[in-house]
């Protein structure tokens, strides 16, 4: 059974910086869902380089081999944990578009700690 966890905005940078090394080379797909576009897979099982959040530009940068996918002004981030680890990251941007990064194999992360 999977578990969802909303990541508070003040933790975004630390959360993604902490997992970026573990993401290197992991295969991911990105699906974008909006009322205007419907559901579209924009990257299919491409090796990842990492994910970073830039507070100054309010930008989530998903680095993949062959190019980056940038989400400007993210409003909400929810991660899904499967029994074997983190399986997806769902991001809703300021316009209400949902973008989901799914990992082909769950990512085992150390337990989250709040500071």
What role is predicted for each listed range?
Residues 60-62, 91:
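SH3/SH3-like beta-barrel fold
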Residues 2, 11, 30, 113-115:
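Mixed-charge (acidic/basic) macromolecular-recognition segments
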Residues 37-47:
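Short coil-to-beta-strand transition motifs
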Residues 52-57:
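Short, conserved beta-turn/loop elements at beta-strand boundaries and strand-helix junctions
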Residues 2-24:
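N-terminal leader/targeting segments and the immediate start of mature chains
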Residues 24-33:
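A short, Trp-centered hydrophobic/proline-enriched beta-strand micro-motif
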Residues 62-73:
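Short solvent-exposed strand/turn elements
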Residues 73-115:
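Helix-rich interaction surfaces within compact, conserved domain-sized segments
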